[in-house]
Amino acid sequence: VHGILGTDNSKRDIWSGVIAGVKWAMLIGLLTALVSVSIGVVYGVISAYVGGWKDSLMQRIFEIFISVPMLPVLIVMSAVFKPNIWVMIGIMCIFYWVGPVKTVRSMGLQIKEETYIEASRALGASNTRIIFKHMVPLLIPYAFASMALNVPGAIVVEATLSLLGLGDPNIVTWGQILQDAHNGGAMLSGMWWWVVPPGLAIAFMGMTFAFVGFAMDKILNPKLKTR
């Protein structure tokens, strides 16, 4: 056994793999969270602003997406198509955008009744300008909190798919290291250093962003401070 965390059965340094996995974990988590939350915030604001039958239609579409289980779809898509990290991120974005919609819509319904929104409409401001100039900026703090809470989910989903052998084999992720450890019989051979470090890395990264998200949520929602 050599190196800080030892080597696997192919003499690859585990520490180097764990460090390389940080880059991909951050990319997968942050990119998925950024794209999905941005879509969800804009969708929720538009739904709240337009109202009427358009709002009802948008909410029915939202309910269809939120009722579809993401992980089975990801497993099927990864099995049908060649495993690719960008396809995986794209599919996660398709399902993750529904997360903030309900909360954003309820906040948007309150914002659109504000006096300055009515004044902007009376002065002839377009709906697009009102939505993106006056409403969306007020939801940016909530969007950041939502992003922080979405990052752990994206990292865990990628690790799950990689552990099942459906991840991108061309990149080094923590899930891919665990999959290699499983195939290499690490647990049967007692090679705990091949399994524990990437597992702890996933847990640590997930907890870090989760705590950041909870802290931001408490700041944005004073009612949570009393709990």
Where are these regions (language model features)?
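Alpha-helical transmembrane segments of integral membrane proteins
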Residues: T7-R227
